[in-house]
From Swiss-Prot:
Disulfide bonds: none
GO MF, any single term: DNA binding
Organism from which the protein derives: Saccharomyces cerevisiae (strain ATCC 204508 / S288c)
HTH CENPB-type domain mapped to chain residues: 63-138
Keywords for this protein: DNA-binding
Function: Essential for the synthesis of pyruvate decarboxylase. May be important for a high basal level of PDC gene expression or play a positive role in the autoregulation control of PDC1 and PDC5.
Bias (Basic and acidic residues): 674-686
Further details from the record: Present with 572 molecules/cell in log phase SD medium.
Name assigned to this protein: Protein PDC2
Length: 925
């Protein structure tokens, strides 16, 4: 059997003689290693298939016959990082300290990465240090020596040293953070909700002095595989192994080196492996090189054994590396130019598509040259886009720019560098590129533009140079195989110990809830539920954009009002081109109704999909939708934009949704709402019949009335006046429909604490009474039986039936919920400490605690679902007051005119005027 050393040498010969056949390699191995027989062609083939593994093996592994996976691999990686930076910073460490640190690290890592019981013996520590080439017997007495770190004042010594090195063999490298999906609308960047969604990747660049060798960029992301990678490999299997390999295939496609960890940081382990791999190839061609780098934490390696690479460390505080003198600014400038060009291209395509569509329909609402705003979801780049832009930006940096930066750094004698033009020793920027970037900043239509100088000096793009904490070391060592799917609803059992929140159960509502849809021409109707997890954040973003309209550096939005308004109106219903925009569009709302017996559709001032905002994935798109036509798709799949029938009227419109305060009112927590309702507990509680339909009607009415104080307010009509007109008109209500005042008070109290509606099969005939006493135009979608007579149940009877089947007091429910939450948090803390061996508990006790903990989670989940189903019903105390006024007036009218009300027998006979409407053509029921 071939040893690791022999396999490594065969791989070296394959690197040195790429034209050799596998048979020639086998003969060479037979003669060189004095083997008993010639290795077979299959043996050489399998060996070369794992060439990267054998080329990256460490010195202590070469004597073995096979590579074995060590136990507690993650602990070893973290401990190696910790020991390296401790020794580098002169912190004394001993074997007992290393043992305690290893045990602490073992308890910090996730349970799936743990092996053994967390106990590390002296022998284990000794073997571990020997693989790092650290003698444990000497470690207790004297720290290993670290490499020399050169300061800026010592650069004259470096000049004399570097003057003896051939320019092609003198390299430099440096890394920096790159916020690859940075929003180029500064108003979006200022929104804290969007800042949390900005992703950062680490990019390392390396080149020699004369620019003849520019190594492929090293990129470190957060996941081994991103969802966007499937744009280039759509036919790959969906199993976890194939999914995790997409990152390697993407790196090979774009000719970059890709790695990942949770922090997206370049660690010393990754850097060490990268150096070892390069050193093996240099040994194969018998070439020696020198690398100039800084002493940041990711470069700190102890006892690095490299044969053909010499590292020259400089102080990271002085920042006199060549790349700091202009290469990084030029790289970022070229990256942002590509990003701006892609966004401007998307805006132009949308505008051109809509203009062509208008011409075909003889609609000239958008003047030529007008553009539309693009939301953050449409403008953010993915990692696959970043790969493409990073590679192109690095390849486009000219050789003279690299030479000029070497000369400006002052590390080399002037005679070593020959340029086509004189370059001063001062810092020199690429003024041509910066002028292009500045022009694109002005050309891109947005709420508030970036200053191009700020784009090159972001705080989030400053790399780490300090001592890393243990928690940071743990996070930077864990590798996540695949990017999580944020579009799916969270699972109910996903509870975090450190931040226990019952809101994780909010997405598990039953699907029998009515889907409320409101439409208005000035708000985006394409609020798709598959992107609903970002709904609230998008609302804050729109609010942030509005607040910046008056900024001095912002674009003039008023110049494009006509285009934006047209886009907003055009997106209400693409299939319906007629009708008054101010009137309810019933046809556009038919598709939003669910299959319940009685469906309620209310025409309001806000286009909000409540189930979408609650992350209810009831309408997952199977085909490409408007949100699929974004800048990322334009970069990865430009063919999607070539269809002549493509309609982009619903794409890229950054609609001005209501402010975040509106949603906080509509979706306020059940606790706050029930505290308001608790003040009415002293009222009588006469039991009334139940009706699911009117319970739903009450919830919609409550949500509608709650929005009256927002940016586009509408007032609540005077119900007493309306009902008094009804009594004056000569019509009367049947005495069987009369409701006592105690019952009305009971309804006011209990309507804020309904836990669940009973009798879902009841289908009352929905009728609304207008100011003249005649039934209003039907807004409730359930058909009215043509055979019904005047004795049919009236609207008041339906309203009376909405309050039966009440759950226990809302105060009691919420009190029990809060108690369960507190107990669950306490049990979670206890089990966490027990798992870390901070407290000693028997196995039976831990099992009992775990059983109780899971039982509490189920109770919390059930209660949370119960409260969430009524969250829209109980949001407004003011709505309850108006409803009480309505019912009180109705009861008074019923007492005086009991048998004079004649209702029509068919929905087609309903009159078209004098509806009970809210201002803004919005029906109350």
């Amino acid at each position: 059997m071939l040893s690791i050393q022999q396999r490594y040498n065969i791989c070296l010969m394959a690197e040195r003689h790429p034209k050799w056949t596998q048979l020639e390699l086998a003969k060479w191995a037979y003669e060189t290693f004095q083997l008993p027989k010639i290795p077979s062609q299959g043996t050489i083939s399998r060996l070369l298939a794992r060439k990267s593994t054998y080329m990256n093996c460490k010195e202590h592994e070469k004597d073995a016959n096979r590579l074995r996976k060590p136990n507690n691999l993650l602990v070893r990686k973290i401990l190696q990082e910790w020991i390296s930076q401790s020794l580098w910073n002169g912190i004394p460490i001993t074997s007992p300290i290393i043992q305690d640190t290893a045990q602490a690290v073992w308890h910090r890592i996730p349970a799936e990465h743990r092996e053994g019981n967390g106990s590390f013996s002296y022998k284990w520590i000794s073997n571990f240090l020997s693989k790092m080439d650290v003698n444990i017997s000497v470690l207790d007495e004297e720290l290993p020596k670290t490499p020399k770190v050169w300061t800026f004042e010592e650069r004259d010594v470096l000049k004399a040293y570097f003057s003896k090195i051939p320019p092609k063999d003198l390299f430099t490298l440096d890394e920096a953070f790159l916020s690859y999906n940075l929003p180029l609308d500064y108003a979006q960047y200022e929104a804290s909700s969007i800042q949390r969604r900005i992703e950062v990747a680490t990019v390392m660049l390396c080149s020699n002095l004369d620019g003849s060798e520019k190594l492929k960029p090293v990129v470190v992301g957060k996941y081994d595989s991103y969802k966007s990678f499937r744009n280039y490999f759509p036919n790959e299997p969906n199993d976890p192994v194939s999914q995790s390999m997409l990152g390697t295939k993407m790196a090979k496609k774009f000719d970059i080196s890709y790695h990942s960890n949770r922090k997206a940081w370049l660690t010393s382990n990754l850097f060490h492996n990268w150096l070892v791999r390069w050193d093996k190839r240099l040994v194969a061609v018998n070439r020696k090189i020198w690398i100039v780098l800084d002493d940041s934490c990711c470069h700190r390696i102890i006892n690095l054994r490299l044969q053909n690479i010499k590292l020259v460390y400089t102080s990271s505080n002085s920042k006199f590396l060549p790349f700091n003198w202009g290469v990084w600014d030029e790289f970022k400038t070229r990256y942002r130019i590509q990003q701006y060009q892609a966004l401007i291209d998307l805006q132009n395509r949308i505008s051109k598509n809509i203009q062509n569509k208008n011409k075909s329909e003889r609609n000239e609402c958008i003047p030529n040259g007008k553009k539309c705003l693009i939301s953050f979801e449409q403008s953010q780049l993915t990692m696959s886009n970043a790969f493409k832009f990073i590679k192109k930006a690095w390849d486009d940096i000219p050789v003279d720019a690299i030479k000029a930066n070497w000369k400006s750094s002052g590390l080399l004698p002037p005679e070593m560098i020959h340029l086509n033009e004189n370059v001063s020793m001062a810092f020199k920027k690429n003024e041509v590129l910066e002028s292009v970037l500045n022009r694109l900043c002005d050309e891109y239509y947005c709420v508030k533009k970036w200053e191009y100088e700020m784009l090159l000096d972001l705080n989030i793009e400053n790399k780490n140079t300090n001592f890393l904490s243990t928690e940071e070391l743990v996070e930077s060592a864990i590798v996540e195989p695949c990017e999580p799917d944020f579009d799916t609803a969270p699972k109910g059992n996903e509870v975090h110990d450190d931040n226990f929140d019952v809101s994780v159960f909010a997405n598990e509502d039953d699907n029998n809830q009515n889907h409320l849809s409101m439409s208005q021409a000035s708000h985006n109707p394409d609020y798709n539920s598959n992107h609903s997890n970002n709904a609230i954040e998008n609302t804050n973003n729109r609010g942030s954009n509005n607040n910046n309209n008056n900024n001095g550096s912002s674009n003039n939005i008023n110049d494009n009002d006509s285009s934006v308004k047209y886009l907003q109106q055009n997106t209400v219903d693409n299939s319906t081109k007629t009708g008054n925009p101010g009137q309810p569009n019933i046809s556009s709302m038919e598709s939003q109704r669910n299959s319940s017996t009685t469906d309620l559709v209310v025409d309001g001032n806000y286009d909000v999909n409540f189930n979408g905002l609650l992350n209810d994935p009831y309408n997952t798109m199977k085909q490409p939708g408007p949100l699929d036509y974004n800048v990322s798709t334009l970069i990865d799949k430009p063919n999607l934009f070539l269809s002549p029938d493509l309609d982009l009227s619903t794409v890229g419109v950054d609609m001005q949704l209501p402010s975040s305060e509106y949603f906080s009112e509509v979706f306020s927590s059940a606790i706050r709402n029930n505290e308001k309702a608790a003040s009415d507990q002293n009222k009588s509680t006469d039991e009334l019949p139940s009706s699911t339909a009117m319970a739903n009607s009450n919830s919609i009415t409550t949500a509608l009335l709650e929005s009256r104080n927002q940016a586009q307010p509408f007032d609540v009509p005077h119900m007493n006046g309306l009902l008094s007109d009804t009594s004056k008109s000569g019509h009367s209500v049947n005495s069987s429909n009369a409701i006592s005042q105690n019952s009305l008070n009971n309804f006011q109290h209990n309507s804020a604490s309904v836990a669940e509606a009973s009798s879902p099969s009841i289908t009352p005939s929905p009728v609304a009474i207008n100011s003249t006493g005649a039934p209003a135009r039907s807004i409730i979608s359930a058909p009215i039986d043509s055979n019904s007579s005047a004795s049919s149940p009236s609207a008041l009877e339906h309203l009376e039936g909405a309050v039966s089947g009440m759950s226990p007091s809302s105060t009691t429910i919420l009190s029990n919920l809060q108690t369960n939450i507190n107990i669950a948090k306490s049990l979670s803390t206890i089990m966490k400490h027990a798992e870390s061996n901070e407290i000693s508990l028997t196995k039976e006790t831990i099992n009992e605690l775990n059983f109780n903990y899971l039982t509490l989670l189920k109770r919390i989940k059930k209660t949370r679902k119960q409260l969430n189903s009524e969250s829209i019903k109980i949001n407004s105390k003011n709505a309850q007051d108006h409803l009480e006024t309505l019912l009180s007036g109705a009861a008074a009218a019923a007492a005086t005119s009991a048998n004079n009300l004649d209702l029509p027998t068919g929905g087609s006979n309903l009159p078209d005027s004098n509806n009970l409407h809210l201002p803004g053509n919005t029906g109350f029921f």
